[in-house]
Amino acid sequence: MATVIRLTKMGRKKKPFYRIVVTDSRKKRDGGWIESLGYYNPLVEPALVKYDAQRLEYWKNVGAKMSERVAKLTSKK
């Protein structure tokens, strides 16, 4: 199973926030996920990003690929 770390959209119309999740690469964006690692809220100023760094590192070491957006968000800390 090829795993990826990516964002899944939550919230409501015009008020989105995103979860940082580990999922199978073949699933849809908002399909089921294996583990939730954190969240990203772009609506507050400054944008809020919180995630479990240990679990993120674990999944990267196991072989999960990160999406470009998640890589940018997690490198800012």
Curated annotation (Swiss-Prot):
One of its GO terms (cellular component) is cytoplasm. GO terms for molecular function: structural constituent of ribosome. It comes from Helicobacter hepaticus (strain ATCC 51449 / 3B1). PANTHER family: 30S RIBOSOMAL PROTEIN S16, SMALL RIBOSOMAL SUBUNIT PROTEIN BS16M. One of its GO terms (biological process) is translation. This is Small ribosomal subunit protein bS16. Belongs to the bacterial ribosomal protein bS16 family. It comes from the Bacteria. It holds the Pfam family Ribosomal_S16. Keywords: Ribonucleoprotein, Ribosomal protein.
